[in-house]
Amino acid sequence: SLGVRKVIFIPDKYLAQNIAKETDIEIITWDNGSCEVHELFTPEDLIEARDSVDNLKIIAHPECPPNVISEADFSGSTAKMIEWVSENKPDKVMMVTECSMSDNISAENPDVEFIRPCNLCPHMKKITLPKILDNLLYLNNEVKIDPVIAKKAFHAVDRMIKLDIS
């Protein structure tokens, strides 16, 4: 527990809604924020997949809409989905998230058949190892924040970093 009754949660409205369902915390969110990949999934997609694939387990990223999460067998962060597959070793699994995630996890779980509903993220595809190296070497995309804004934000950011959620 965070020891608070109300939290401002941005930028993803679906993640905020899913967290609100799991906690007793009032969550204030920004209605325009969502992941374009995760919001493309519908409950009907999951129902259709389950009807057409025997013994299918469905795991969904919590940035999916709540009605999609309610059709899944498990919902968790990317790390939690990886952990779930490794621990449960389902015969067949559909990961309701960006499709390259299944590609990454399938290499470590060759006995699991991955059903891939493929929604590609155009933004994630822009990230490449050469671009990361270039940015680390030359700091090409440095973000500069107005000192007045930085000072106002410092205490909130510092509290988030120090927060013990274990």
Language model regions located:
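The feature marks the mature, well-folded catalytic cores of soluble enzymes
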Residues: 1-166
